[in-house]
């Protein structure tokens, strides 16, 4: 079993796992012609892969002791499906932040929304996947930690929780770092942390009835002027379609194949 952890024995641990709904990483991604944002309807929507590792790590922690796991996601109405999918792995409840004004929000706005949704809920540990497959910026966990004034422990491939203290190992080019912190704290995990479980049929059915809050910006005390494409500090100004691949040259060997190959290599200036 990869990854390891220990629980705070005898203490209820409240864990929040932030997940993102993204286009399937194997599908061709497209940008919207109107505002140059990612066209999320152009491919199947799935739970961000690394976020599944975050959910798994949270579940392993509470299974070694006591606690509850809440899934938090920000996104359009369809993102509720990804919250339910994460709950079906074994989490207890979900929070979905959905508002039309969120369209086009950048990492700064995303971190603001997530932090406001987390505030005041008494979470001991907030876990993220280290990056999302649609943006790959790897900055939202650190931004959320900064907004909440909490320690951040990023890119963890091993998580240990014991006696109210958190220890993570982070692989580096020269070995690994061992970082310690008190709780509450924010952690982001990489794919080497564990192996995400498949939801059982029982948990899939239970996820349909699990409590889930659907909140607007107003519900978490934010104004639309703080989020969205118009207020984003990072935007795509222009883009171009990838050039189509040219058809390859087919050489038929009629007894002089070697000469044809040599001639082709000469014309391409390879020799």
Where are these regions (language model features)?
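N-terminal glycine-rich FAD/FM-binding segment characteristic of electron-transfer flavoproteins
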Residues: 2-271
């Amino acid at each position: 079993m990869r990854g390891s952890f220990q629980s705070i024995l005898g203490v209820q641990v409240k864990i929040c796992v932030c997940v993102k709904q993204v286009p399937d990483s194997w599908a061709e991604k497209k940008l919207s012609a109107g505002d140059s944002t990612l066209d999320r309807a152009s491919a199947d929507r799935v739970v961000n892969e690394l976020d599944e590792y975050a959910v798994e790590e949270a579940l392993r922690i509470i299974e070694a002791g006591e606690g509850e796991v809440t899934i938090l996601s920000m996104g359009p109405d369809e993102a509720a499906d990804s919250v339910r999918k994460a709950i079906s792995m074994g989490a207890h409840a979900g929070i979905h932040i959905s508002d039309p004004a969120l369209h086009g929000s950048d990492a700064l706005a995303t971190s603001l929304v997530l932090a406001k949704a987390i505030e005041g809920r008494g979470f001991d540990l907030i876990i993220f996947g280290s990056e999302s497959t649609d943006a790959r910026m790897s900055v939202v966990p650190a931004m959320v930690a900064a907004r909440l004034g909490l320690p951040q422990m990023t890119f963890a491939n091993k998580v240990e929780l014991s006696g109210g203290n958190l220890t993570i190992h982070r692989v580096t080019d020269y070995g690994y770092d061992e970082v310690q912190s008190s709780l509450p704290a924010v952690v982001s995990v990489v794919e080497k942390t564990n192996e995400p479980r498949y939801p059982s049929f029982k948990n899939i059915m239970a996820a349909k009835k699990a409590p889930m809050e659907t909140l607007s910006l107003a519900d978490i005390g934010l104004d639309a002027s703080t989020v969205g494409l118009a207020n984003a500090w990072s935007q795509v100004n222009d883009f171009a379609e990838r050039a189509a691949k040219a058809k390859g040259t087919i050489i038929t060997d009629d007894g002089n194949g070697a000469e044809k190959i040599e001639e082709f290599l000469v014309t391409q200036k390879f020799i």
